[in-house]
Amino acid sequence: MFQGASALTLDAKGRMSVPARYREALQGQAEGRVTVTKHPDGCLLLFPRPEWEVFRAKIAALPMDAHWWRRIFLGNAMDVDLDSAGRILVSPELRMAAGLEKEVMLLGMGSHFELWDSQTYIAKEQAAMAQGMPDALKNFTF
């Protein structure tokens, strides 16, 4: 289970050091294998490979009228492995798609991660908070 936010930096080659608290889980759960793809909100999704296979099967089973969503999620997916220093390489294509340059935010989302450009994430989070709670959370107890 992945949770929490980590402010990270991409190096000149587009590599991101995975926080130590996640490395052991990724090694144990997925032998260090991760799949990265686009998300329509403007971030990237990072899945441990077994979780990716579950997600991939759901996307592949979508009806024909969702063929563009298959292209977005599956057509842009790239398999990567943690290197010996605990880093993953984010491809130039995916970095460009999510506007990632140097400062990024990695968010644990349970079974997977979201990877955001730091400034984009801050702006979207502030906009969401300014809108107030959605109806789905109105009766939620904190």
UniProtKB/Swiss-Prot annotation:
MF GO annotations: DNA-binding transcription factor activity; transcription cis-regulatory region binding
Keyword Transcription regulation assigned: yes
Record's keyword annotation contains Lipoprotein: no
Pfam families: MraZ
Subcellular location: Cytoplasm, Nucleoid
One GO BP: negative regulation of DNA-templated transcription initiation
Residues of the SpoVT-AbrB domain: 5-51, 77-120
GO CC terms: cytoplasm; nucleoid
N-terminal signal peptide: none
UniProt cross-references to CDD domains, sorted A to Z: MraZ_C, MraZ_N
Keywords annotated in UniProt: Cytoplasm, DNA-binding, Repeat, Transcription, Transcription regulation
SUPFAM superfamilies according to UniProt: AbrB/MazE/MraZ-like
Family the entry assigns: Belongs to the MraZ family.
Subunit comment: Forms oligomers.
Protein's name according to its UniProt entry: Transcriptional regulator MraZ
Phylogenetic placement of the source organism: Bacteria, Pseudomonadati, Pseudomonadota, Betaproteobacteria, Burkholderiales
Recorded name of the encoding gene: mraZ
